[in-house]
């Protein structure tokens, strides 16, 4: 059994070698010749999986180690009788922590408290729900918009997008990309929406590039609209609008979900799905794969305020470490993908063991996802 895996899927070689012969290949582009005798294909979001790639090939199963699936023609796979699995929620924690790292940086730079801001969350799936929970644990007001879930009658106080635009100080997008249909998200943030944002608002896109109209956004910024912008995703990736990059406050190369834990979850989820597909079901404990974190433990004295939280968050991950490299190479062919391929190891907050002498600080840090314990001061 021959299994092709994206060369940038961590732990893929070791895991899938339990099931067959593994060949690691670049994800963009996949060499069609390598598909000629392969039984399974494991990809990331950079690989377009459709009829033109797989027609006439012996592939029986496709797995994507990503939460999003807009790069996969699922309807064609089903029609062709090819098994498929994604990894929903695998990088949700990573994206939430990216948003926090960005907001805490902007709050420190611009001198505001997040408690004084209302956060509008567009898309309340695996990422949006986790973001809502962590924000509300801190006492930060959230407004939720998710028309598909609202129409299904899912639990939640869902508002219209217009209401979020009117009342939110921070608007963050966490939707799939739907190019048409009743829940179209292509250019959901169009010129009209962008111009309608509150003065001084923060706009964040860490889902799919085309959810925000990049041309319209650049026009508004060039005209002097007072707006802070965080973009991890871009229309036309791996190409991006270099002028837009110079105008945004934080720009990164589609790495919001790139924690080691998130990548490992994606790989293990599709590994388990494929092992079940071929009748040799196996399960993998994530902690058996991950290395020891760089920081073993730290001690925190006193209550948890915003500056202290910012220091803890940035000790694990400071978004600026990914902003600067992109600005240096923007516009150079191949460099966007190179930044992603050679991405420095990044961990999640749970990797940081925090010993607190304040019980409320320990409790709150645990709610936020840190590995925190209370030890009273002696």
Curated annotation (Swiss-Prot):
It is an enzyme of class 1 (oxidoreductase). Catalyzes the oxidation of erythronate-4-phosphate to 3-hydroxy-2-oxo-4-phosphonooxybutanoate. The keyword Acetylation does not apply. PANTHER family: FORMATE DEHYDROGENASE 1. Keywords: Cytoplasm, NAD, Oxidoreductase, Pyridoxine biosynthesis. NCBIfam families: PRK00257.1, PRK15438.1. Belongs to the D-isomer specific 2-hydroxyacid dehydrogenase family. PdxB subfamily. The lineage of its organism: Bacteria, Pseudomonadati, Pseudomonadota, Gammaproteobacteria, Enterobacterales. GO terms for molecular function: 4-phosphoerythronate dehydrogenase activity; NAD binding; protein dimerization activity. Substrate binds at residues 45, 66, 258. Pfam families: 2-Hacid_dh (PF00389), 2-Hacid_dh_C (PF02826), DUF3410 (PF11890). This is Erythronate-4-phosphate dehydrogenase. GO terms for cellular component: cytosol. NAD(+) binds at residues 146, 175, 232, 257. One of its GO terms (biological process) is pyridoxine biosynthetic process. Its EC number is 1.1.1.290.
């Amino acid at each position: 059994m021959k299994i092709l895996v994206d060369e940038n899927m961590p732990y893929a070689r070791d895991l899938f070698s339990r099931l067959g012969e593994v060949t690691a290949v670049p994800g963009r582009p996949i060499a069609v010749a390598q598909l000629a005798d392969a039984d399974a294909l494991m990809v990331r979001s950079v690989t377009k999986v459709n009829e033109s790639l797989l027609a006439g090939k012996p592939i029986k199963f496709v797995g994507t180690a990503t939460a999003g699936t807009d790069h996969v023609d699922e309807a064609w796979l089903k029609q062709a009788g090819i098994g498929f699995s994604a990894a929903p929620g695998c990088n949700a924690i990573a994206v939430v922590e990216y948003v926090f790292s960005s907001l805490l940086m902007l709050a420190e730079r611009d001198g505001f408290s997040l408690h004084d801001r209302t956060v509008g969350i567009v898309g309340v799936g695996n990422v949006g729900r986790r973001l809502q929970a962590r924000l509300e644990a801190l006492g930060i007001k959230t407004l939720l918009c998710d028309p598909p879930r609202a129409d299904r009658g899912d639990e939640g106080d869902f508002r219209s997008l217009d209401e979020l635009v009117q009342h939110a100080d921070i608007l963050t997008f966490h939707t799939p990309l739907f190019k048409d249909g009743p829940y179209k998200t292509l250019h959901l943030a169009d010129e009209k929406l962008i111009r309608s944002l509150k003065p001084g608002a923060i706009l964040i896109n860490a889902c799919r590039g085309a959810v925000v109209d990049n041309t319209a956004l650049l026009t508004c910024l060039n005209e002097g609209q007072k707006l802070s912008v965080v973009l991890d995703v871009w229309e036309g990736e791996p190409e991006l609008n270099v002028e837009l990059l110079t105008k945004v406050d934080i720009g990164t190369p589609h790495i919001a979900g790139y924690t080691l834990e998130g990548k490992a979850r994606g790989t293990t989820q599709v590994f388990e799905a494929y092992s079940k597909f071929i009748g040799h079901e196996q399960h993998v404990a994530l902690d058996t794969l991950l290395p020891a974190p760089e920081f073993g433990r730290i001690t925190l004295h006193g209550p948890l305020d915003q500056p202290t939280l910012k220091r803890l968050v940035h000790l694990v991950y400071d978004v600026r470490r990914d902003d600067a490299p992109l600005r240096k190479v923007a516009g150079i062919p191949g460099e966007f993908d190179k930044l992603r391929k050679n991405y420095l190891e990044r961990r999640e907050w749970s990797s940081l063991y925090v010993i607190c002498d304040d019980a409320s600080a320990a409790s709150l840090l645990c709610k936020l996802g840190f590995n925190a314990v209370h030890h009273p001061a002696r």
